[in-house]
Design a protein with these regions (language model features):
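Glycine-rich loop(s) and the adjacent beta-strand/alpha-helix scaffold that form part
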Residues: 10, 23-27, 36-114, 274, ...
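Short, conserved active-site loop motifs that form the nucleotide-linked donor/cofactor pocket
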Residues: 12-14, 270
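General small-molecule cofactor/ligand-binding pocket signal
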Residues: 14-16, 223-224
């Protein structure tokens, strides 16, 4: 909202809430987008209404999962498999990082209020005996006993969870998951289905083992991690905060959905500017790259509309 508020007083900006885009509309030949169909909900009266918004240019930014789903739902005679999907690439190459939450327990209470202020990339490009990327490590910003409860043994008393929380030094580990066309977003019976098989697990497991070794050696040096207790939890398909890759950009219309300006190869005026455009995702948070790319595409659109 900090980015939206400064422009809300402009006459050419309108923000509609309680709205869900259900279909992207095209002209008769399917060469350009004419607008979007929107469903409005009124929870107070349990009513819905539908409206159509038109525009010379349509930009989709629903997140990699929902942007792909919207295109797949927007079927027509010209696009029976989904809009902008002549390549059959829409929804494919879904990525969200191999991630692991790891908690080390210290002999000292951890009262640091600014934990998420640094990152560790020492192993990002591998090691001398393992010349393959492994990933990044960073502290977790905050940690509560309720977060430990989900992974603690049954009937663990609350006071024990609080002690563990007070002594916790939590870490977040990320390794790149590789683009795989079989990892994908699909629309089945009107609902969204994610199909995903983890990959690059050798690098992921090595990063976890390597970091545990670092923590253990830190403990031997100064007793900070003397308990040698490490709670680990891999983040599975439900943790898709770093979703990307479902409408990859590229120069070949047969192997990508978008061109290098994030315009759909199949349509003259449809753009996608969320994490969908990633052809690969690296092993760091994608947010800043998504923002930078959106600004880049915005500059392109300004030039186009002059």
């Amino acid at each position: 909202m900090n980015c939206v508020r400064p422009v809300m007083d402009r006459s050419n900006v309108t923000l509609r809430t309680g709205a869900k885009v259900t279909n992207v509309l095209t002209n008769a030949t399917g060469t350009s987008v004419t607008g979007v169909e929107v469903e409005f909900s009124d929870p107070a009266n349990c009513q819905t209404s539908v409206a159509t918004f038109t525009g010379d240019i349509v930009v989709i930014a629903c997140g990699a999962i929902n942007s792909a789903a919207l295109l797949l739902k927007s079927v027509s005679d010209r696009y029976p498999n989904g809009l902008a999907n002549s390549s059959d690439m829409v929804g494919r190459h879904f990525m969200f990082h191999n991630s692991d939450a790891m908690v080390a327990l210290s002999t000292h209470e951890n009262d640091d209020k600014y934990m998420k202020t640094f990152g560790i990339n020492d192993f990002y490009f591998g090691e001398p005996d393992y010349p393959y990327p492994m990933g990044s490590i960073q502290p977790v910003g905050s940690f509560k006993k309720e977060m430990m409860k989900s992974d603690a043994p049954p009937l663990t008393p609350g006071f024990a969870l609080k002690i563990a929380k007070d002594h916790a030094v939590p870490w977040w580990l990320m390794t790149e998951d590789l683009p795989d066309p079989n990892n994908r977003v699909r629309v089945v019976d009107g609902g969204i289905r994610l199909e995903y098989i983890p990959n690059n697990q050798t690098s992921f497991n090595r990063l976890k083992t390597r970091w545990i070794d670092v923590l253990k050696r830190s403990g031997h040096a100064n007793a900070v991690f003397a308990w040698h207790a490490y709670f680990k939890k891999d983040v599975n398909i439900e943790g898709v905060g770093h979703q990307n890759g479902t409408c990859r950009f590229g120069e070949d219309p047969k192997q990508s959905v978008l061109d290098l300006n994030c315009r759909a190869h199949d349509l003259d005026n449809l753009y996608v500017v969320d994490g969908s455009f990633f052809p690969s995702c690296g092993a760091v948070n994608p947010s800043l790259t998504i923002i930078a790319n959106a600004i880049r595409v915005a500059d392109h659109l300004i030039d186009r509309m002059k």
